[in-house]
Amino acid sequence: MDIQLGRSKVVRRAYGIDEIALVPGGRTVDPEVTDTSWTLGGIERSIPIIASAMDGVVDVEMAVRLSQLGALGVLNLEGVQTRYEDPNPVLDRIAAVGKDAFVPLMQELYSQPVQESLIRQRIEEIKRKGGIAAVSGTPVAALKYRTATVSYTHLTLPTNREV
């Protein structure tokens, strides 16, 4: 289903996790004759899962484990993993905070700058442990931190302007 966005842009409808329900079908498919593999920029994966680039979801260990299982974990280029040498105490603070104190805490935590050295370190850790290093960031961050990631890049995805 296409949606008109502005005067000249048409976009596809996307769905969130709370909008999707899986219901068993009327037909049974033998697992031996199915193929769930997919390819992105020459990287083949066997499980059709891309884990969200959220601090509470993907860290170095999760990215490596997902790679080993055949999926893809994406690290948040602008999250706590690249702002703090040890992000675990920060994540513990986020998990423990109440609703009223959440916004001030996030403002405090995200006031720390992203460290290019941590971007490099996290990518190196993932690759050294045998994982596929994938990162996600805003377009501004992609340009700002390209020197921290470009030497590790093995594929280039086209932008909307190139498509």
Where are these regions (language model features)?
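Active-site entrance/lid segments in N-terminal catalytic domains of soluble metabolic enzymes
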Residues: 1-155, 161
